[in-house]
Amino acid sequence: MHHSFIQRLILTTLLLVSFGVCAVKTGFAQTLDADWPVWRGPRGDGSWNAPRLSDDWPAEGLPVEWSNAIGGGYAGISVAGNRVITMDRQIVEGTEERSNGQETKASKTELERVFCLDLKTGKELWAFEYDQPYGDLDYGNGPRAAPTIHGDIVLTIGALGKLNCLRIADGTIVWSHDLVKDFKGRPPMWGYAASPRVYNDHVIVFSGGDDGFCVLAFDLKTGQLKWHSLSDKAGYSWPVPIRRKGHTQLVCWTPSHIRAIDADDGRPLWSIPYEVTYGVSIATPIIHEDIALVCGYWAGSRAIKLGEEPESADLLWEENRYLRGLMAQPIYRDGYVYLLDKQYGLTCFELQTGKKLWDDKNTLTPRGRNPQASIVWLNEEGRTDRNRILALNAEGELVLATTSPDGFSEQARSKIIDPTWAHPAFVGDRVLARSDQKLVCVRLPVAD
């Protein structure tokens, strides 16, 4: 009797353990992402822990939960709790009296605005705005960089270098800087676009100042400058921290180099020259398999092999015929990279060699002058396969597809917003997207 009980207990325990392992492997135990706090999502890698999505999308379009009129801009959307935060540009037209007190003339006030909406209703919770004339800034629709939410604060950077740290509760200011006036900043041709990066208790930003003021690190709580490094001009790419041999370095892609600096003090570690036309170092570097990959437009892609020591790195391969990205962020999975090439569309290639396997012949998004699609990997609840993506293309179409080394296959497509280059946010079973006129919250169809 006692032995039988023990046997049953052991068997039950083994079954429970086995079920737990299966649950982890199949995704049943996965925690869904309720927040999208930074550029490219909770892990900063363009992956979304999502519910299992249905392939059957309504012909009349996906249901819009709410829509809110906003101003222009390319800034992505960030979400924490019930707060949806992004940036736009507001132009206030008016009149002012001339000195004689009788005549009037037209006036225009240009503002950059950080604003917060309620996730459930779209109602505005707060807004923080400041004067920011754009002058002759090209593509001057509005701010470019997605807000960075960290705990109870949100960090933003405007197109011409206004860096703000705000309280997420009410939008009141904690600290602020003007990168151009205060730190020798040189805005890129199309304005600052790299979001602030939080590393430990530092806020890392690209200023592009000479004399060692390209990369700046500020104290997260006080805004005090802690260190500064490099003298390159600023690009548009997000710095990436990586841990190697017990040491953290920041990989930075500037218009003239692929570099790494010490994440704690800014000390330069290694540098590979790579001059990009018009300074368009845009996409965030992909770092896997001891390789740092950047994908440029006119001069193509470069893969850097990271050495054993923090100061060592060498060019592994380069390719400038088939692998030429611009704004669209490439994604990586299991040894392969998926890049939106300017001519051939979504393209799959091997990270280790740069060997191209296929392209989708511009199926995901139209070719156009500046092809764009914001692509995320789906880690879907209850699915064992890991090769599904969601992409918001330049036409405002949301596309559900399967992509792997074997090819590209579309499952569903629905237009949810006007043409846009801005990155959306994915939370729960919703996608939030913005254009120059509105911000929408759309519910996605979840499989039974």
Language model feature labels by segment:
Residues 1-7:
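N-terminal secretory signal peptides that target proteins for export/translocation
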Residues 10-25:
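Bacterial N-terminal signal peptides
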